[in-house]
Amino acid sequence: MLHSSLLDNTVQLAIDDRVLILNSAADPFVPKAAQQVVAGELLLAEDNIALLQSAYAALEREHSMPGGRNSLSRYRHVPFHEYTLREAPATIDVAVMNMLYQPSNAWLIYGLQVTGYALKPGGRLYVVGAKDRGVLSMAKRMQTLFGNVETLEISKGQRVLCSRKMDRGTWSPDTGQISLVPTIFAEGKLDEGTRLLIEALEVHTTDVALDIGCGAGFIGLHIARLASKGQVTMLDASLAAVDVARQRAEQGGLTNVQVLPSDGVQAVQAQRFDLVVTNPPFHLAGIQTTEIAERFMREAAQVLRPRGRFYVVANRFLKYEPTLRACFKIVEEVGGNTRFKVLRAMDPIRASTRPGDL
């Protein structure tokens, strides 16, 4: 990955540095950084549980290799959205962010604010990104927040930027009030696809239901209200999303809900459900893809009971039907409009061969 090679060439680390990785834990630079800070600490401020698991695996591989020097006790995780709530200010020597891993501008801006809170005076922030991902705008933000920014390297449209936290700046412990959640989860607002999915759902009072990639929880909480004698499990790889969904379940007085961090259905793969729903993302690192949705469909077929129902909402131009037909015997459109379609799939293929099915 070009981004990581640029970081390898430009990020300067001392052996006793405390290094903060800002929502970029899966970057190949991370295990290399761990090898360098043999007397310091590596903090992974990461939101995505799947990427965190990938980072841990890479660090463990590096540790087990001949000559591997990084101690597994010298790195730890803190949820990205809770950094200023859990960590003391002005304790970090170097912070690193790869723009590729940030879902939107809100995450980038929050990362800058966290950096200002976290860095010691004289500490450095390194940001790597592409021009088409907004690295030039990022440079302007860094200049505004820190009063300085330097371009350390340019290669094939990629840049490495560096800002230093000055001895006297606008940052103080009061910036612990920084919050990511309100900017990425609009209170009380349903997107069009979610609304159409909710309208099309058939929910039974006793349903045992699963919401894969629940986000802020609109779909799962709607099901929980209708399945009053059932149980709803909501999953998301985003720790921020899990927190928001849990809070909304508590605020709604819903006791038949559990919300779990999970990479796909990993956390519940041994369980079986009457109803499975998803409104999957179709962008990954800024690139349109059906990879995540297709994975959710295959996993839904593995956890759905033979007589269960699976619902997915998608933009009309996304061709989910071939994957659905490979996983289910019955696939039909049950809702939507000119922009979106709601698909229902039933009778998962080979469902009767799986243990635990009823």
Region locations from a protein language model:
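Conserved proline-anchored active-site loop of SAM-dependent methyltransferases
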Residues: 94-105, 212-216, 273-287, 300
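Core SAM-dependent methyltransferase catalytic element
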Residues: 159-176, 329, 336-358
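SAM-dependent Rossmann-like transferase core, predominantly class I methyltransferases
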Residues: 2-6, 151-208, 215
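N-terminal auxiliary segments of SAM/dcSAM-dependent transferases
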Residues: 102, 106-175
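Conserved SAM/SAH cofactor-binding pocket of Class I
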Residues: 1-76, 192-278
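Glycine-centered, small-residue-biased loops immediately flanking beta-strands
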Residues: 123, 230, 308
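Short beta->alpha hinge that forms the Motif I/post-I loop of the SAM-binding pocket
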Residues: 47, 130, 236-241, 292, ...
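A short glycine-rich, Lys/Arg-flanked "PGG" loop and its adjoining helix->strand segment in the class I
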Residues: 109-121, 293-306
